[in-house]
Design a protein with these regions (language model features):
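C-terminal substrate-binding/active-site "lid" region of AdoMet-derived donor-dependent transferases
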Residues: 165-187
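Short internal loop-to-helix segment that lines adenine-nucleotide cofactor pockets
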Residues: 10-30, 90-152, 164-169, 173
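Receiver (REC) domain switch-region micro-motif
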Residues: 31, 35, 133, 157
Length: 229
């Protein structure tokens, strides 16, 4: 898998996260990779979904998107679709950036102006409804979850959570939409120990009554022995 960027080509980039993501993606799925960065999840999920499925990669940063497009061209040209939008609860434009790290750029800060789209807006524009969403939005995840629950789609969701307030907002909205929310091991530890939040650990949200998928997720290293929120 040819990629640029130190650490990505080693096969050791966020191994536990991508093990869990691989469990929730199947042949024929429509995957939305929201906050695609350089495309590691895009490349992996494109291989899993095969020609029967599709991957739609959302990356608002011009610089990140240039690497993403390069990686798609090298590895899965014609099978992954790169879109220049941030997702949130409304359509419009917003400031974007606010960090020297390409992995920590977010809405509402920075010097770059980017296009923002709602999930319903993207569906109206002809993007096929997702069966799986992977989200890493640097603190805007609750806005994306709000957009999701306002829409008519109910995909399986894997979402990076950047602080406890985002966890509470996302969990409340997902419960209202009848999702079961599984915290990863690090989130469960933060909650059990009442310790300071660190990093961007994940949740997986499943439409209720999908016990088979829940069991598969619960056997991964990241979600083993956790209790639903």
């Amino acid at each position: 898998m040819p990629v640029s960027g130190r650490g990505f080509a080693s096969g050791r980039f966020e191994v536990a996260k991508f093990e869990a993501l691989a469990v929730i993606v199947s042949t024929g799925d429509v995957v939305w990779d929201v906050g695609a960065h350089y495309g590691y999840a895009t490349l992996m999920t494109t291989r899993i979904v095969g020609p029967e499925g599709s991957v739609w990669s959302f990356e608002p940063s011009r610089l990140n998107r240039s690497y993403l497009k390069r990686h798609v061209a090298w590895n899965c040209s014609g099978r992954a679709n790169v879109l220049p939008y941030a997702l949130a609860e409304r359509d419009g434009t917003e400031a974007f950036g606010g960090s020297d790290s390409s992995m920590a750029l977010g809405l509402g800060r920075g010097d770059e102006e980017v296009e923002v789209r709602s999930i319903s807006g993207m569906l109206d524009a002809g993007v096929p409804p997702p069966t799986v969403m992977k989200v890493d939005a640097e603190g805007s995840e609750s806005r994306i979850v709000e957009s999701l629950v306002r829409s008519e789609v109910r995909p399986v969701l894997m979402c990076a959570i950047h602080d406890q307030s985002q966890l509470e907002l996302c969990t409340e909205a997902l419960h209202q939409a009848d999702y079961e929310v599984l915290p990863s091991g690090p989130i469960q530890k933060f909650l059990n120990d009442d310790s300071a939040w660190r990093g961007d650990p994940d949740i997986v949200a499943l439409p209720r009554n999908d016990s088979r998928l829940r069991d598969r997720v619960s056997r991964t290293d990241l979600f083993r022995d956790v209790s639903a929120l």
